[in-house]
Amino acid sequence: DFIIMNIASVFNGNQDPGSNKLIDELLSTVIPDVNLNLNPDIIAKVIEYSKVATLIVVVDLNRPAILSSIDNFVDGLVGTFGVSDEVIFKMIFGDFNPTGKLPFEIPKSMNEVLLQKEDLPDDTDLPTYSFGFGLSY
């Protein structure tokens, strides 16, 4: 048994990923949420589900997110960029070999984000996942 949990980085995981890409992009531009932490309710669900079965978390990364709060509780973590549920399931069930590299780093904490230089990308001290991180198989 396993659980697949799909969360979005836009608005701290409170919105269904890809529910309306145009609205996602518009709202995240007009009303950017500077807090990259996941909502505490989402974190609690990840912890709860991790106790029940193997947990694969799929995060739609419209923007970077703080994933260190869930990283130790998941058996698999997949970062996506606006793909459909069908594509996610095909990848998980082995219909194709995924490949990909992060186009930005995933910071460990909001403190790291606040300490980085605005004009220098990927300069946090200890990111959870570095720029270019990714797996292929």
PLM feature segments, named:
Residues D1-Y137:
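C-terminal non-catalytic regions of proteins with extracellular/luminal or membrane-system context
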